[in-house]
Regions:
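Class I SAM-dependent methyltransferase "Motif I" SAM/SAH-binding loop
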Residues: 12-20, 139-140
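Conserved beta-strand signature within the Rossmann-like core of class I S-adenosyl-L-methionine
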Residues: 102-104, 131-139
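Conserved Class I S-adenosyl-L-methionine
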Residues: 142-166
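A short glycine-rich, Lys/Arg-flanked "PGG" loop and its adjoining helix->strand segment in the class I
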Residues: 115-132
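Conserved alpha-helix/loop element of class I SAM-dependent methyltransferases that forms part
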Residues: 1-10
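SAM/dcSAM-binding transferase cores
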Residues: 56-59, 73-80, 85, 95, ...
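A short acidic, Gly/Pro-enriched loop at the edge of an enzyme's catalytic core
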Residues: 93-102
Length: 215
């Protein structure tokens, strides 16, 4: 995307938790593109105690950086900057300035936290995503995938971790390489349900021209 060409990668993280997404992603970006700068925004309903963070990460730079980010709400150095917006993510999304190159969607499951897996939230995420950007979530639930499809995302399989089901990866528009396709039977079932379900059926996917980040 444009941000990556400029040497800046912007990432939105819905569900900060212990900061695992932050640490793993920063390490990978720095390994692949040492000169890139990462701008990170996390949305979190309620932060975990600092002691939990420190127990998980122990000593070292990662622990120090994440502790500062959580305790102050922001962090800024040459390689990366971050900020955490605490509160209802649906409200925080309205105040965000996109576009983001990548989005992690890791709130509690659709069964435990259904409001964060609605079509409205998925559309709000679509609107702050760069054209050609990627959304990744651990969830393989039909509810999550249906909401993503209804909001205009292209969806595919995420990587399988151990015995867990593959998560879901979605893109705003086409990407290269393409997403790993769902099984045909699974995709047909989702498309049929998308057409049948009241509420989702009436929510037309936004056209590229409707997105706030269209080029």
């Amino acid at each position: 995307g444009r941000a990556q060409l400029a040497g800046v990668v912007r990432i939105l993280d819905v569900g900060f938790g212990l900061g695992v997404n932050v640490a793993v992603t920063l390490e990978e970006i720095h390994r692949q593109v040492p000169d890139a700068r990462c701008e990170w925004v996390s949305l979190e309903k309620e932060l975990l105690p600092l002691v939990d963070l420190q127990e998980h990460w122990g000593e070292g730079k990662v622990a120090r950086d994440l502790t500062e980010l959580v305790s102050k709400g922001s962090f800024d150095e040459e390689f990366w900057s971050g900020r955490i917006l605490v509160g209802d993510a649906r409200d925080s999304l309205r105040s965000l300035n996109g576009p983001f190159d990548a989005i992690y969607l890791d709130p509690f499951s659709p069964a435990r936290n259904p409001e964060m897996w609605s079509v409205e939230v998925m559309r709000a995420l679509w609107e702050v995503c760069e054209e050609g950007g990627i959304l990744s979530t651990y969830s393989s639930a039909a509810k999550a995938r249906l909401a993503l499809m209804a909001a205009g995302w292209e969806i595919g399989l995420g990587p399988r971790v151990g015995r867990k089901s593959s998560g879901t990866v979605a893109s705003r528009g086409s990407v290269d390489p393409p997403l790993m396709a769902l099984e045909e039977k699974q995709r047909r079932s989702l498309e049929r349900r998308l057409n049948e379900e009241t509420g989702i059926n009436g929510c037309d996917p936004p056209s590229p021209a409707a997105g706030i980040n269209s080029p």
